[in-house]
């Protein structure tokens, strides 16, 4: 999948039976195209984050009102595995996705869930190559545990505030990448 993406960008060329070679784009156009692509990617991520912040503010309130104790326990199990991986530096992408997916489900609103899933799929595409950030969005990971605790306490304002901090960390990574 990664090679296909690089091939589509003209960065590599795949020759059947011969291997993978550096693409044929000229240096000048490559630099300009990279700069334009970087700017568009950054702007798209910022816009997606703005939409996510607005939607998740209400999502948090719905989760606090609608989630069952069983769902909270399941989110707790996901959070525990996620945080263990974060603490030892293991890859945590799958657990991070499970965490957010579970929260989306816990709102018990199928339309809201569907809209959030579309936004989630869009940001996943953008984050395939996240602005050349090494270890992107790691600063946001500790907030997952405190967000879970606030949700479990059913404290809407506290959970919303923590979720905003989580998204602020992601935004900061994107802003730093642009400097």
Go through each PLM region and give its residues:
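Conserved amphipathic alpha-helical segments that form helical-bundle/coiled-coil interaction surfaces
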Residues: 48-129, 139-144, 158-173, 177
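Structural signature of alpha-solenoid helical repeat scaffolds
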Residues: 132-135
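Short linear motifs at protein or domain termini
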Residues: 1-54, 61, 65
């Amino acid at each position: 999948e990664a090679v296909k993406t690089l091939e589509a960008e003209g960065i590599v060329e795949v020759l059947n039976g011969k291997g993978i070679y550096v693409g044929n784009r000229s240096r000048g156009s490559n630099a300009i195209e990279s700069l334009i692509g970087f700017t568009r990617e950054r702007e798209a991520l910022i816009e997606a984050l703005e939409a996510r912040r607005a939607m998740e503010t209400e999502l948090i309130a719905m989760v606090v009102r609608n989630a069952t104790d069983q769902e909270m326990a399941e989110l707790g199990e996901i959070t525990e595995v996620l945080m263990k991986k974060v603490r030892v530096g293991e890859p945590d992408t799958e657990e991070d996705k499970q965490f957010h997916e579970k929260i989306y489900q816990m709102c018990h609103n199928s339309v809201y869930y569907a809209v959030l899933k579309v936004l989630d799929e869009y940001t996943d595409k953008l984050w395939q190559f996240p602005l050349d950030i090494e270890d992107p969005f790691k600063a946001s990971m500790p907030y997952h545990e405190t967000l879970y605790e606030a949700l479990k306490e059913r404290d809407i304002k506290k959970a919303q505030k923590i979720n905003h901090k989580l998204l602020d960390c992601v935004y900061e990574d994107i802003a730093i990448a642009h400097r």
